[in-house]
Design a protein with these regions (language model features):
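Short, strongly hydrophobic alpha-helical membrane anchors
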Residues: 1-71
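Membrane-embedded helix-loop-helix hairpins and adjacent transmembrane boundary segments
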Residues: 2, 60-590
């Protein structure tokens, strides 16, 4: 292990004497999947979304760093228990009377644009953002900041194309919009299948990561103990959803996002003060303590190896985020389209501020810790933020950052579980099984039961994939959302002729092509960071299928619409256009 930067608060001795460098943890697929030991193709999937790989690597990083500097697991446990206790109390207080579908599914549309915007940003200002982006900047400089740009730009799709019209046209789910003027049964089944599949892939990765984070922070090394940690994390998630519904889940996300933003802002201010509030001084010292030297201030240190895969990833990232079911559902928690605009503006500005702070944190980590120490520490470049936290605040700050990371994961998994349960209860049970005649209380009961089932399945799946590289799950969820959902929504909202065959074709072609291409890609086999690294049956050369599956979904939707029979319903078409543009007649919370 190389020495840290001269004069830094963290040196190589602490790392080498922890034993983690020589342990099996340092050689798992989780660590090997880092940017340092893989190319753009493998890395992009890991950093493009909140993935189990990033979270698990973050957990390894936290444990190694806290062990190295003598952090107390009891402190971490106390912070975890404290956060869970406080948030459960708040969820219970704000969620009384969650017996109607409007209240349980959409919080009665009672949140303001500002509150909803903070909750929206909380879905993405995650442990991966904090650790991954800060670490990428610390090691690679300018190129490490590119993902931040992609995440912010992605929200413009929601602001300009989807948000307002979706809120005005639907009530609770994407299925409401797509099935508005089409045959209800097949379209709602397709929409529910898409939502459940995307949510489960996302949820599986997150719940495994949450359990892994808790297990590693508390120094639980046995498989049985780690399984218990995953089960506990899943149980907490289920409690949030059962007790709180959308209102309670939203408050958890608001609290988590606020903590994360405050934590990042305070660290940034402290770092700027340490360098005389002169960012140039930070950059100058960073170049001296990074093996790349001045190159970290210019593009080209990381990207350019596989342009086509990067374009494919960019498409999935920019077009997928605002097509994710749990994001779409959040547009219904505000009273009108104006508040949707405000929500997205708040979310965008929150993320802009956060990612600007990562510039200071990332370059400061290089300046104070040194890129060599970061790269060779357990967890690779994801160790930048924990090592920096100890350098400036000791074990207490490390514990706080750990608690915030855990809060981040819980907020995300609660939102995903709620989305999946609502989609089944509203689109399948109420609209298809009960043919629109379900009692609100019975529909909410079905939603709660579905949440428990989804939670149990996620726990079991998380235990099964514990310790494996499942980065492809979230990458697949993002590509699925961009392929299956975006094309269907845009056609439904903007193309009068779009019909039931077109909707089914766009959804199922997006789902099928994504799963097929990812199965036969380097993500699953044929590479050292693959799910099955010892075999090679990949035939698709790219790690992200977005560049193929997204256009294919649009094409299939168009072809099926053109060859299918016209579904003339002028009255429904006019009603949909008026509602989409004005919100008149939406009756969302009636």
């Amino acid at each position: 292990v190389n020495h840290a930067a001269p004069g830094s608060a963290f040196n190589h001795t602490a790392v080498t004497h922890t034993g983690f460098v020589k342990s099996g943890w340092a050689h798992t697929g989780l660590v090997k999947s880092g940017l340092v030991k893989s190319g753009l193709v493998k890395t992009a999937l890991v950093k493009a979304a909140v993935t189990k790989t990033v979270v698990a690597k973050a957990a390894v990083t936290f444990l190694a760093a806290t062990t190295a500097v003598g952090s107390n697991p009891v402190l971490n446990l106390g912070l975890f228990v404290g956060f869970v206790a406080v948030t459960l109390y708040i969820v219970h207080r704000v969620s009384s009377g969650n017996q109607t579908t409007s209240s349980y599914y959409a919080a009665g549309g009672e949140f303001t644009g500002g509150q909803n915007g903070i909750a929206l940003s909380g879905d993405f200002l995650s442990a991966a953002s904090f650790l991954g982006i800060a670490g990428g900047i610390a090691v690679h400089g300018y190129d490490g900041f590119v993902y931040s740009v992609g995440w912010v730009v992605a929200w413009l799709v929601g602001l300009l194309l989807v948000g307002e019209m979706l809120r005005n046209t639907g009530r609770f789910t994407m299925g409401d919009v797509v099935a508005f003027r089409m045959r209800q049964r097949p379209v709602r089944v397709a929409a529910a299948a898409s939502t459940l599949l995307i949510s489960y892939f996302y949820l599986l990765a997150q719940i495994a990561g949450a359990g892994g984070l808790v297990a590693l922070l508390l120094n639980i090394t046995g498989k049985f103990g780690q399984s218990i940690a995953i089960a506990v994390a899943g149980a907490i998630m289920i409690l949030y959803v059962l007790i709180g519904g959308m209102k309670g889940t939203t408050w958890v996300q608001i609290i988590k996002a606020t903590l994360l933003l405050m934590c990042m802002a305070l660290i940034t201010i402290f770092l700027l003060g340490r360098f005389g509030f002169n960012f140039s001084t930070i950059l100058s010292q960073a170049t001296q303590h990074n093996s790349l030297g001045n190159a970290i201030l210019t593009p080209g240190t990381l990207y350019g190896k596989n342009e086509l895969d990067f374009v494919s990833l960019a498409l999935a990232l920019v077009l997928g985020i605002c097509s994710l079911p749990h994001v779409l559902m959040r547009f219904y928690t505000v009273p009108n389209a104006r508040q949707v605009r405000r929500s997205l503006v708040w979310a965008i500005w929150s993320m802009v501020g956060f990612y600007l702070c990562t510039l200071v944190v990332g370059y400061s980590a290089t300046a104070l810790v040194g890129s060599d120490a970061i790269v060779h520490a357990p967890g690779g470049e994801n160790s930048a933020a924990p090592l920096l936290a100890y350098a400036i605040g000791g074990s207490i700050l490390l514990g706080l950052v750990s608690a915030v990371a855990f809060a981040t994961i819980l907020a995300v998994v609660a939102g995903l579980t709620l989305t999946a349960s609502v989609s089944f209860a509203h689109d399948v049970y109420a609209s298809i099984i009960k043919k629109g005649n379900a009692e609100p209380r019975s529909e909410v009961r079905v939603a709660r039961l579905t949440a428990v089932i989804m939670g149990v399945l996620a726990i079991l799946g998380g235990i099964l994939v514990n310790g494996r590289n499942v980065a492809f799950l979230v990458a697949l969820a993002l590509a699925l959302a961009a392929s299956a959902n975006l094309s269907t929504l845009l056609y439904s909202l903007f193309w009068k002729r779009f019909n039931t065959p077109g909707a089914l074709a766009s959804i199922y072609s997006g789902l099928g092509s994504c799963i097929l291409l990812i199965t036969f890609s380097p993500v699953v086999s044929g590479a050292s960071t693959s799910i099955f690294p010892t075999v090679d049956f990949h035939v698709f050369p790219l790690s992200n299928p977005g560049i193929v599956s997204i256009p294919l979904s649009f094409l299939c939707g168009w072809v099926a619409t053109m060859i299918g029979s016209r579904e003339e319903n002028p009255a429904k078409q006019v009603e949909m256009e008026v509602r989409a543009m004005t919100g008149i007649g939406s009756g969302l919370h009636s």
